[in-house]
């Protein structure tokens, strides 16, 4: 993605904003070319400056607003607007919900899966709390010009924005992040330097259980042996509600934030979260939704649309720590969960024991390979739930699903574009009964939704 290259010689231009883009930016036109302007809203007339030119579009910077939208609200004070994760914070919450319903409708129109005009796309379900809802903070730390900074990178750049406050994070996780920064400064712990590619602490991850208040800290480091890291961890353990400190080791060439190796320095191996009466142990790398209160809504919708019966076998694909399968275990004969990450499978098995679930089994491997094997073994695959990453389902998996043909399945998606694209192939054999958007991340354009598909009888 192209980095902003601001040209001071560019003149100010006046643009009327027509709509919002998929990333929450305002979209207008200048000399018949589309221009994206972050921070601008539909029906606003704005003064902007072109900061980057591409063959088919322009990138703009908002200078000032000439005619303001009635849907505009005050952006949180004391926060740099350039920070990621607040792309819609200037838009009223009811309009954010409309925008997220519009996102999936636009994606369906773009890819037009079979009979998409007939799809029932419901209104977005709002979250109970539009602020301070994220129970996991993952801040980058760096040392530059004689002082340390802790926060998030500006989109598409390596410019770290210091964050004394991030209004979507819980107060407790933010406080722990800031206290750890103070300890790093006080103890002179080495901070990784991306300019010189030197070892040290790169990222601080803090996750808090909504159910118990327990806090789990992971220090993500470049290199394994960081001087006085254990001393730092011992001080972190004294902070309120902190029950464990881990080190995750990665390398500069790894494009992901987390590396593959995690070791416990002090405390508990897991923290425990609770959803719909079930308990889940979470190790540092285990995936879990970032908005615990709204997770209850998301999973309740998924279970509602699965409409399970006691004689069914449910396949929980992309099972993670077993959340959905364990929640559904009371309603079916058997649950078989499939997950590619070994640590997550161990967590899922432990979560079964924790909840006294005896009809669920979790196996490590790829869904594309294991589904046909299960069918060949005589396992009745009549219900399925998939909760894939943003990339959606692979074509190989879709081909497998069209061969195995579970009678009904629910697709939990975090990307309307890949959902719509996948429905193009899936709609050859399945009818889409309903798409229910659920707002998991207010103030951002991030989308989540539950889709119910039923096998067409004449196929």
UniProtKB/Swiss-Prot annotation:
- Could you name the active-site residues? 414
Q: What Gene3D superfamilies does the database record attribute to this sequence?
A: 2.40.50.1070, Nucleic acid-binding proteins, Vaccinia Virus protein VP39
Can you give the residue ranges of the TRAM domain? Answer: 6-64
Entry's EC annotation: 2.1.1.-
| Keyword hit for Lipid metabolism | no
GO molecular function term, any single one: rRNA (uridine-C5-)-methyltransferase activity
Residues binding S-adenosyl-L-methionine, per UniProt: 289, 318, 339, 387
PROSITE patterns listed in its UniProt record: SAM_MT_RNA_M5U (PS51687), TRAM (PS50926), TRMA_1 (PS01230)
Entry-linked SUPFAM superfamilies? Nucleic acid-binding proteins, S-adenosyl-L-methionine-dependent methyltransferases
- PANTHER family xref list: PTHR11061:SF45, RNA M5U METHYLTRANSFERASE
Provide the protein name. Answer: Uncharacterized RNA methyltransferase LJ_1606
């Amino acid at each position: 993605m192209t980095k902003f290259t601001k040209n001071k010689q560019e003149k100010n231009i006046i643009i009327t904003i027509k709509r919002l883009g998929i990333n929450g930016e305002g979209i207008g036109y200048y000399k018949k070319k589309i221009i994206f302007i972050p921070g601008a809203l539909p029906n606003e007339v704005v003064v902007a400056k072109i900061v980057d030119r591409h063959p088919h579009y322009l990138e703009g910077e908002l200078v000032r607003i000439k005619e303001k939208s009635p849907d505009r609200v005050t952006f949180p004070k004391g926060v740099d607007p350039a920070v990621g994760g607040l792309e819609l914070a200037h838009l009223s919450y009811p309009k954010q919900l409309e925008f997220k319903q519009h996102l999936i409708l636009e994606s369906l129109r773009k890819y037009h899966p079979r009979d998409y005009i007939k799809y029932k796309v419901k209104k977005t379900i709002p979250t109970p709390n539009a602020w301070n809802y994220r129970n996991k903070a993952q801040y980058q730390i760096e040392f530059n010009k004689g002082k340390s900074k802790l926060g998030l990178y500006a989109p598409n750049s390596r410019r770290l924005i210091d964050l004394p406050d991030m209004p979507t994070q819980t107060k407790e996780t933010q406080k722990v992040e800031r206290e750890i920064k103070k300890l790093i400064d006080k103890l002179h712990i080495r901070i990784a330097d991306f300019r010189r590619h030197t070892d040290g602490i790169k990222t601080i991850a803090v996750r808090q259980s909504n159910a118990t208040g327990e806090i789990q800290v992971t220090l993500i480091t470049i290199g394994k042996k960081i001087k006085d890291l254990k001393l730092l961890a011992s001080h972190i353990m004294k902070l309120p509600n902190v029950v464990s400190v881990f080190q995750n080791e990665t390398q500069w060439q790894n494009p992901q934030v987390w590396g593959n190796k995690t070791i416990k320095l002090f405390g508990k191996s897991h923290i425990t979260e609770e959803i719909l009466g079930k308990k889940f142990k979470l190790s540092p790398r285990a995936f879990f939704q970032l908005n615990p209160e709204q997770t209850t809504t998301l999973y309740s919708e998924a279970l509602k649309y699965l409409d399970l019966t006691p004689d069914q076998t449910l396949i929980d694909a992309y099972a993670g720590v077993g959340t959905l399968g364990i929640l559904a275990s009371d309603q079916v004969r058997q649950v078989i969960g499939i997950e590619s990450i070994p640590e997550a499978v161990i967590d899922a098995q432990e979560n079964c024991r924790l909840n006294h679930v005896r009809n669920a089994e979790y196996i490590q491997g790829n869904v594309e390979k294991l589904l046909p094997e299960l069918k060949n073994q005589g396992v009745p695959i009549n219900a399925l739930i998939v909760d894939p990453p943003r990339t959606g389902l692979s074509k190989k998996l879709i081909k497998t699903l069209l061969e195995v043909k579970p009678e009904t399945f629910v697709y939990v998606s975090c990307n309307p574009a890949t959902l719509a694209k996948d429905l193009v192939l899936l709609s050859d054999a399945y009818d889409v009964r309903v798409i229910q958007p659920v707002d998991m991340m207010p103030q951002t354009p991030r989308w989540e939704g539950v889709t119910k598909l039923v096998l067409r009888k004449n196929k």
